[in-house]
Amino acid sequence: MFQPTGPLLELAPKKVANARRNLAEAGLADFVDIRQGDARQTLRELGGLVDFVLIDGWPGGKGPSLARQIMEIVAPQIRVGGPVMNDNGEQDYLAYVRDPADGFRSMSLPLKGATEASIKVS
């Protein structure tokens, strides 16, 4: 039987409402903890290991990209062997996951032009 293993985080209220509706219609609402808010805050309150991460934010702006900021917060919480997907290919994010010192193995996939798949190895 399915057991809840972690939350779904989303910033946009409409996407949260759609996710809740879709999960309810599928009979899965009891298995997902949907948290609305900025991932840079909500990720700090997970309270356990993370099994899978999908980073699909907005690239751009000055300073570290949103993907890089999120990865620096969540990386210590990802279990060894845990996969991470990012579909924007921000250069500072790629530098992080491709640096062996940060504990990931990473490769680009030919999807959407800039999808990166990573596995936490240490």
Identify the residue ranges that each predicted region occupies.
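Conserved SAM-binding loop of SAM-dependent methyltransferases across substrates and taxa
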Residues: M1-Q3
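Conserved SAM-binding motif I beta-strand of class I
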Residues: T5-E10
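S-adenosyl-L-methionine
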Residues: A12-F52
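Short, glycine/acidic-enriched loop or turn micro-motifs at the edges of active sites
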Residues: P13, Q41, G57-G60, G89-Q91
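Short SAM/SAH-binding signature in class I
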Residues: G48-G57, P83
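C-terminal substrate-binding/active-site "lid" region of AdoMet-derived donor-dependent transferases
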Residues: G61-S122
